[in-house]
A protein has these predicted regions:
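Short, well-ordered amphipathic alpha-helical segments that serve as non-catalytic structural scaffolds
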Residues: 32-42, 77-82
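Glycine-rich tight-turn/loop motif centered on a GG-T
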Residues: 24-28, 63-73
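Conserved strand-turn element in the central/C-terminal portion of the radical SAM core barrel
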Residues: 13-24
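Charged (often Lys/Glu-rich) extended helix/loop segments that serve as interaction or gating elements
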Residues: 77, 83, 91-248
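Single conserved hydrophobic/aromatic residue that forms the stacking wall/gate
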Residues: 1-7, 11-12
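Active-site/ligand-binding-proximal alpha/beta "capping" segment
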Residues: 8-9, 24-39
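Glycine-rich beta-strand-to-loop/alpha-helix junction loops that act as flexible
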Residues: 18-19, 52-59, 98-102
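Short helix-capping segments at alpha-helix termini
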Residues: 9, 42-47, 84-91, 119-122
Length: 248
């Protein structure tokens, strides 16, 4: 690729993507060294790369079992790696950029579900259903992703001795948001708050089984405004067209 770009002025930046939800710092340290080596290789073909975009990949704490590094630790690791490698090879420091997505926006969002029915299978588990599921959050069924949650009326999960499997409303055996999550005693109509849904949930949402998307609200300093209206059944049908040949 570098050879094919000889004579081009477009080769000024090297961009990378090494993965997602990464909890270790070593891969990012290695990335800094590798990207500086790309600068060296590019120089052999007359290119002067002045910018390095290390992408993102920093994980977040979805559950108590997750232990990601801080953003400060991540930035320090990458920048130190690039500085060290540039010094070793006598290179000018490039402009260093990153694309932190999930690590910033995920914890800025929560999802609220309302509890509907309960189903207890004695000696096995207790199911509770909510008014959402895989259409607004496909990540559990797609990636086996885990989240933290609490009852809105009991945000600190005091006396959380009950285990529930929380299922969605989509008539799918895989439409399960939580398996055996510990919560305080729940009742029909209670609200469940799921944390860390600010990234991917909205962008990956769908109208599977003709389920309308929920509304989105912006909450700041005690005020809340709708920033995405709740969809209605009419919204789901307005783009459907019946061909004239079927109309008698």
């Amino acid at each position: 690729m570098l050879r094919r770009l000889v004579g081009s002025e477009m080769c000024i930046r090297d961009s990378a993507h090494i993965g997602s939800q990464i909890f270790e710092l070593e891969p990012h340290e290695d990335l800094g060294e590798i990207m500086v080596k790309v600068i060296l290789d590019a120089k052999k073909f007359g290119h002067n790369i002045k910018e390095l975009n290390v992408g993102g990949g920093l994980g977040i704490k979805y559950t108590t079992n997750d232990d990601p590094p801080s953003i400060d630790e991540w930035v320090k690791t990458i920048s130190n790696s690039v500085v060290k490698a540039c010094k070793k090879h006598n290179l000018d420091l490039p402009k260093l950029m990153c694309e932190p997505g999930r690590s910033i926006v995920s914890t800025a969002g929560i999802t609220i579900y309302k509890i509907g029915a309960f189903k207890e299978i004695p000696g096995i588990r207790t199911y509770l259903s909510v008014d959402g599921g895989m259409s607004d959050n496909p990540r559990p069924i797609t990636y086996q992703s885990n989240y933290s949650a609490c009852l809105v009326k009991n945000p600190f999960n005091i006396n959380s001795k009950n285990k529930y499997t929380i299922a969605g409303k989509h008539c799918e055996s895989g439409d399960v948001l939580f398996k055996e999550i510990e919560l305080a005693n729940c009742e029909t109509g209670d609200l469940i708050c799921v944390f860390g849904t600010g990234a991917y949930n909205n962008s990956m949402s769908s109208n599977y089984n003709r389920i309308p998307r929920p509304a989105a609200l912006l909450v700041c300093n005690g005020e809340a405004e709708i920033i995405q209206k709740r969809e209605s059944p009419i919204d789901l049908l307005k783009y459907d067209v019946l061909p004239d040949r079927f109309i008698k």
